[in-house]
Design a protein with these regions (language model features):
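Conserved AMP-binding/adenylate-forming core of the ANL superfamily
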Residues: 59-64, 72, 80-125, 129-133, ...
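AMP-binding/adenylate-forming catalytic core of the ANL superfamily
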Residues: 166, 291, 299, 409, ...
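Conserved AMP-binding A3 loop
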Residues: 92-94, 210-234
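Conserved AMP-binding/adenylation subdomain of ANL enzymes
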Residues: 233-250, 257-298, 312
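Conserved ATP/PPi-binding loop(s) of AMP-dependent carboxylate-activating enzymes
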Residues: 380-384, 395-432, 475
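Gly/Ser/Thr-rich phosphate-binding loop
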Residues: 296-301, 310-374, 386
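AMP-binding/adenylate-forming catalytic domain of the ANL superfamily
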Residues: 532-554
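Conserved pre-ATP/AMP-binding loop-to-beta segment of ANL
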Residues: 80, 197-214, 220-221, 244-250
């Protein structure tokens, strides 16, 4: 499958996880928490000086310590079950394991060793899944690169991550110039059969670094977030828990693996022994065809995709999907008008609204039975996480009081690769935990403003660096955008402010109309006047054909503001 290719090991080489206090293997004396056919054991673990809650997961009697175990647990009991569907290509768990181990042999032959950083620059595909698990089985670190990125961004990530090897294909390889790696370190995917040498996996433990995932760059140069095997397995387990997933799930993959939730969908599907269907086309008609053809049970997407599916020309709201059990939203707030529409057109489908940041994966989810009751809420903390809302003095906020969201507990990343300054700023000692003995617990200070209601449900206000001052009030861009979406006149909208003078700001709403021919700025202005208080109303309506997007499919707010500023400086 790959010239200089990629694979996985037999339960990670039979390694043991040691109790750090007693220096003995963890055994039955360790507490276990039932989870259907699975159980979880907890251990306090120290990872690079940070306190972590280590979760060990058992499915069908096999302990899961590292990511390659997600596959290997199914070697016998799910061998013939379909693990991946990519167009006409259907791969069983047995074949996926075989291809991964074969790929690992070639990676070893190419010189990949434990601890090496290996960049993967491929589209979502069977080949990219094989590459991921082959690298992990060797104890190497994946640096995942979105295939929509261009030469400059790809070379930056390869260089900054200190990648020793690059796995790509001929199509993407030809687009790369001035690559920091020598040609013998660039491994090209092909479809050839490989020699049958025996694969020898490396010893891997859960605390090992598994992934460096680069942020989309919507807030400046992308930062490399370091995630351990424990981080990624814990994230998959927690999502499995609150979505109530079973091994009968057929999950459609719309999001890139370089986006944390896109990768989580893959890991979750493999954790439960389900099926992942890779869907590259984001055209509403193509998505709808896949939902019914493959009998999809679960789908996750970002607001841009939901807005397209909710459009007047989309078949999504006019088609029934009897097998679809749930949908999840992440990467931004889903407009209330869209959740109401989906509740009307697909009342049997459960809607999970989620919120998180890559540094802690997921922080909150709003259960489906609360979507109608608490419009605008992002929910409460996910399992094994505590969320605190702190004011500028570091004190707990009262209900209704705005403050910064602080995440403590599961899923906290190791830090930023080669960026100690930003690591120290974002990953800080957990509040109210100092002086309790033991290692210092680290929390993630999100930089997001939120508030809670009397029952503890959280409401997102906005990022610290994106808040808008209007008529003496602090306004969230999302609040303006929600009002604009409710008009049903626009497909996409982003609000931001630019200086008007030394004191005042101009609120700009950049938008893509639902129908360019019938759209009227005058009608939208009348709608805003009738439905929005003055401090929320945009001063400028900026109509565009399309938006620049980040690599994770979100509107690039920084670039939009730059484009508007550049355009208006010409006059």
């Amino acid at each position: 499958m790959i010239q200089h290719v990629i694979p996985v090991p037999p339960l990670c080489g039979g390694r043991e996880i040691l109790d750090t206090k007693a220096s003995r293997p963890l055994g039955d004396a360790f507490p276990k928490e039932p989870l259907g056919s699975a159980f979880v054991a907890y251990q306090d673990d120290i990872t690079k000086g940070f306190f972590r809650s280590l979760k060990l997961i058992s499915i069908a009697g096999n302990m899961i310590y590292c990511l390659s175990d997600l596959l290997l647990q199914h070697r016998n009991d799910r061998a013939s079950h379909i693990a991946l569907i990519d167009g006409q290509h259907r791969l069983s768990y047995a074949e996926l394991i075989r291809q991964t181990e074969r790929c690992g042999v070639q990676l070893q032959a190419a010189g990949v060793q434990r601890g090496d950083h290996v960049a993967i620059y491929l589209q979502r595909s069977v080949e990219s899944v094989v590459a991921l698990f082959a690298v992990w089985s060797l104890g190497a670190v994946v640096v995942i690169i979105n295939d929509v990125l261009k030469n400059r961004q790809v070379n930056y990530i390869i260089d900054h991550s200190e990648a020793s090897f690059l796995i790509t294909d001929n199509r993407l390889r030809t687009s790369l110039t001035e690559c920091p790696l020598s040609p013998d370190r660039i491994l090209i995917v092909d479809s050839g059969e490989l020699a049958g040498e025996k694969f020898t996996p490396s010893r891997v433990i859960g605390a090992d670094l598994a992934l460096i995932i680069y942020t989309s760059g919507s807030t400046g140069m992308p930062k490399g977030i370091m995630l351990s095997h424990n981080n990624l397995i814990s994230g998959a387990r927690i999502v499995t828990d609150y979505l109530h997933l079973t091994r009968d799930e057929i999950i459609v993959s719309l999001l890139p693996f370089s986006f944390d939730y896109g990768l989580n969908q893959l890991l979750t599907a493999l954790l439960i022994g389900g099926t992942l269907v890779i869907q590259r086309s984001l055209l509403p008609a193509d998505i709808c065809n896949t939902l019914n053809r493959e009998r999809i049970t679960g789908m996750g997407a970002v607001p841009m995709v939901w807005q397209q599916l909710a459009g007047d020309r989309s078949p999504f709201t006019k088609t029934q999907f009897p097998h679809l059990r749930y949908i999840t939203n992440t990467g931004g707030r889903m407009p209330e008008s869209i959740t109401k529409l989906f509740r009307q057109t697909h009342p049997h489908v459960q809607i999970y609204l989620m919120f998180g940041l890559t540094e802690a994966f997921r922080s909150t989810f709003l259960p489906p039975d609360q979507v109608d009751v608490r419009p605008g809420s992002i929910g409460k903390a996910i399992p094994n996480v505590e969320l605190l809302v702190l004011n500028e003095r570091g004190e707990l906020c009262k209900p209704g009081e705005e403050g910064e969201l602080v995440h403590r507990g599961a899923n906290i990343a190791i830090g930023y690769w080669r960026d100690p300054e930003n690591t120290a700023q974002r990953f800080r000692p957990a509040p109210f935990q100092q002086g309790k003995g033991g290692q210092t617990e680290i929390a993630v200070y999100s930089g997001d403003y939120v508030k809670t209601d009397e029952e503890g449900f959280i409401y997102f206000i906005g990022r610290k660096d994106q808040m808008i001052k209007s008529h003496g009030m602090r306004v969230s861009p999302e609040e303006i955008e929600d009002c604009i979406f409710a008009s049903r006149m626009v497909l996409h909208a982003v609000a931001f402010a630019v200086p008007f003078d030394e004191v005042r700001s101009t609120i700009v709403i950049a938008l893509v109309p639902s129908d360019h021919k019938s759209f009227s700025q005058k009608e939208l202005s009348l709608y805003c006047k009738a439905n929005m208080p003055e401090y929320l109303r945009p001063d400028v309506v900026w109509q565009l054909e399309s938006f620049p997007l980040t690599s994770s499919g979100k509107p690039d707010r920084v670039r939009l503001k730059e484009m508007y500023t550049e355009q208006n400086q010409k006059f």
